[in-house]
Swiss-Prot record:
GO terms for biological process: DNA-templated transcription initiation. This is TATA-box-binding protein. GO terms for molecular function: DNA binding; DNA-binding transcription factor activity. Keywords: DNA-binding, Repeat, Transcription, Transcription regulation. Pfam families: TBP. It comes from the Archaea. It comes from Methanococcus aeolicus (strain ATCC BAA-1280 / DSM 17508 / OCM 812 / Nankai-3). SUPFAM superfamilies: TATA-box binding protein-like. The gene is tbp. Sequence repeats lie at residues 7-83, 98-173. Belongs to the TBP family. General factor that plays a role in the activation of archaeal genes transcribed by RNA polymerase. Binds specifically to the TATA box promoter element which lies close to the position of transcription initiation.
């Protein structure tokens, strides 16, 4: 039985041009904020797809909040088209790279976090945070495992690694249960 993995955030980066005039962009781009004394980039929020784009003077752009790489690319293309219409000279086809994906899933069981905390690469301080932090080496991701069986997986580069990580943590939990009972 395959568990459902839900991608809840995708962060991508790209370069859209060189030496972007952020003051000008802030004037012509709706739903944008540029306050260089607080943050060096311009923040633009879109509602469809619902994302935030961070545009920097260097031409670097980060897109966060997307539910897929495809949604992030759609958002980037929308903003680039608008900026081209406003007179900016931008890269024709920017290379979009996934920096991080966050997924949620269910273990289908309630793990004993005290038992799990005996494993290497784990941190569990229930007085500080209710979840156990497990730093998996392969795939190289971080899992937040909760006593309810809910799991948050961060540091993903693709959805396939989420399935691999979930299967590994499920097997680890089952092995520990057998060992302790």
């Amino acid at each position: 039985m395959s568990s459902e993995i839900k991608i809840v955030n995708v962060v991508v980066s790209t370069k859209i041009g060189d030496d972007i005039d952020l003051e000008y962009v802030a004037d012509v781009l709706d739903n944008s904020e540029y306050e260089p004394e607080q943050f060096p980039g311009l923040v633009c929020r879109l509602s469809d797809p619902k994302v935030a784009l961070l545009i920097f003077r260097s031409g670097k752009l980060n897109c966060t909040g997307a539910k897929s790489k495809e949604d992030a690319v759609i958002a980037i293309n929308k903003v680039m088209e608008y900026l081209r219409e406003a007179g900016l000279d931008l890269i024709d086809t920017p290379e979009v790279k996934v920096q991080n994906m966050v997924a949620t899933a269910e273990l289908g069981m309630e793990p004993n976090l005290d038992d799990l905390s005996t494993l290497e690469r784990t941190e569990y301080e229930p007085e500080q945070f209710p979840g156990l932090v497990y730093r998996m080496e392969s795939p190289k991701v971080v899992l937040l495992v909760f006593g309810s069986g809910k799991v948050v997986i961060t540091g993903l580069k693709n959805k396939e690694d989420a399935y691999i990580a979930l299967e590994k943590i499920k097997n680890t939990v089952k092995e520990l249960e057998e060992e302790y009972f």
